[in-house]
């Protein structure tokens, strides 16, 4: 992977010939690392990764990618809130009646959000503080170890891109290899049933590959194509991670290559002036 040098200009005014040629692999290998315990606040993720690599009989190589479930990042960074510590505002109380939710949970959703996009009983679709459109701001209480799980809320990391960069840097120091890191989370989609993995934090690989200026099979120039590489890899890894009690939060991806510079996951966010649905 090339060293990071910022986010490329994705505006149409950029020269269409200024593209990064892809080396499309014939094969991708995805391996669920074994032996990762339930993560607690303050746990050393590097040691957990080292133990899992050994137990899985693998060895990290330059160019590998680790896709890490958001939950273990959030737990290690202590992004936990007990609902008994939350005092709901008047706005949260009114909204809670509309959506049939605990007003304390609604207060937490509001505090983690920029705006409400849609609402109905049981769910609030919001733009959260990271700019992601998610149900309930990505707040969850599944797979949270607690005496009363329903009272413990797990928030998204404050800055998933920074979390990914720290983990990548620590792995480079520990293993002397340069890997890519994707932090993924499961999200729903407005016009499709079912959840899938989404990259909410990235370091060491592009979030989006700009294909404008490339040619199709018949030599026609691509004018608008941009590939969400981070999300595609996040979704593939999510198949192995599962959604419930599988206990496979870290997936090793081997075989993806790119000459494009690293981008944070925020590079994949659509600009407000390009949003046709809000």
Predicted regions span which residues?
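N-terminal and secondary-structure boundary signal
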Residues: 24-278
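Short, small-residue-biased leader/transition segments that mark boundaries at the very start
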Residues: 3-20
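Helix-centric, low-specificity signal for extended rod-like, repetitive segments
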Residues: 1-3, 64
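Short, conserved clusters of charged catalytic residues that mark active-site
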Residues: 2, 11, 162, 166
């Amino acid at each position: 992977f090339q060293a990071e040098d910022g986010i490329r200009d994705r505006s149409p005014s950029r020269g269409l010939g200024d593209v990064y040629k892809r080396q499309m692999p014939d094969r991708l290998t995805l391996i669920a690392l074994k032996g990762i315990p339930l993560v607690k606040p303050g746990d050393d993720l590097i040691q957990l990764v080292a133990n899992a690599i050994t137990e899985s009989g693998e060895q990290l190589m330059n160019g590998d990618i680790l896709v890490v479930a958001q939950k273990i990042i959030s737990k290690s960074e202590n992004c936990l809130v007990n609902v008994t510590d939350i005092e709901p505002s008047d706005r949260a109380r009114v909204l809670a009646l509309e959506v049939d939710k605990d007003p304390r949970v609604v207060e937490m959703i509001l505090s983690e959000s920029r705006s409400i996009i849609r609402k109905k009983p049981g769910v609030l679709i919001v733009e959260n503080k990271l700019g992601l459109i998610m149900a309930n701001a990505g707040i969850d209480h599944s797979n949270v170890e607690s005496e009363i799980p329903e009272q413990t809320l797990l928030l998204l990391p404050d800055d998933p891109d920074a979390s990914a960069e720290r983990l990548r840097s620590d792995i480079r120091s520990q293993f002397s290899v340069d890997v890519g890191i994707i932090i993924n989370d499961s999200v729903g989609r407005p016009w499709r049933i079912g959840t899938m993995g989404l990259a909410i934090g990235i370091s060491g690989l592009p979030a989006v590959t700009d294909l404008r200026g490339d040619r199709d099979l018949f030599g026609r120039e691509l004018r608008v194509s941009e590939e969400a590489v981070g999300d595609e890899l996040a979704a593939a890894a999510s198949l192995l991670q599962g959604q419930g009690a599988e206990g496979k939060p870290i997936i090793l991806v081997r075989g993806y290559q790119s000459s494009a510079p690293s981008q944070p996951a925020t590079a994949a966010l659509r600009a407000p002036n390009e949003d046709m649905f809000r």
